C-alpha cells in the first residue's frame, strides 16, 4: 500500500513533472509474470526513476544498513524502505547475501518484478563495475528472464557525495529479456 501511495500520489507525480524521464523499451517488461530487472547503479535516484517508468511494482534489494542505522535518520530510513517493500541485503559476502536471494525467489515465485544492481554498489565515477554472480544464480535457479536495464543521467540528478544535483531528464532503457539457461548443456 505504501509503495503505491509513493508511486502514484506522493513522490511519483512530482518526479514525473520535474524530471520527465525518457523511457525506451518498456515493452520488453512483461505485463504480468516474474522477471529480474538487472540495472546499472549510478546514484540513489536509480531505484526511484526505473520503477516510475513502469506500471508494475518493482521490489529491490537495499543495503542492510538502511534497515539498521541508529537514530532518527535510521528510524525514518527503516520505515521508508520497509514500508516500500524493499529487501535488506548483507553485502559483507556471498554467504551473507543468501537471505536476500531467498527473498528474491519468493518475490519471483509470486509473479512479481525484482530489481537488482549486479555491481552490488553505486558507481562513483559513472563506469560500470564488475558484476556479482547473484543475478545469474537467481535466473538459473528460477528460470526467470533477466531484463537488462540502463539508467542514464541519475548521476547528474543526484550526484554521489553531493546534496544537490542538476535538473536533467534521466533516461531508462530496457533491453530484450535474456534467458540465461539457453546454451547450457543438459
Model-based region annotation:
Residues 1-20, 70-85, 163-167:
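Alpha-helical membrane-targeting segments
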Residues 9-41:
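Helix-to-loop junction immediately C-terminal to a conserved catalytic motif
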Residues 16-23, 97-98, 154-156:
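Short gly/ser/thr-rich secondary-structure transition/capping motifs
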Residues 29, 124-186:
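A cross-family acyltransferase "interaction/gating" segment
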Residues 31-94:
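Catalytic core of membrane glycerolipid acyltransferases/transacylases, capturing the structured
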Residues 45-46, 67-72, 99, 155-162:
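A short, acidic/glycine-rich surface segment
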Residues 49-50, 80, 106, 137-141:
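Hydrophobic/aromatic ligand-binding patch that stacks against planar heteroaromatic rings
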Residues 105-135:
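Catalytic-site beta-strand/loop segments enriched in glycine and acidic/polar residues
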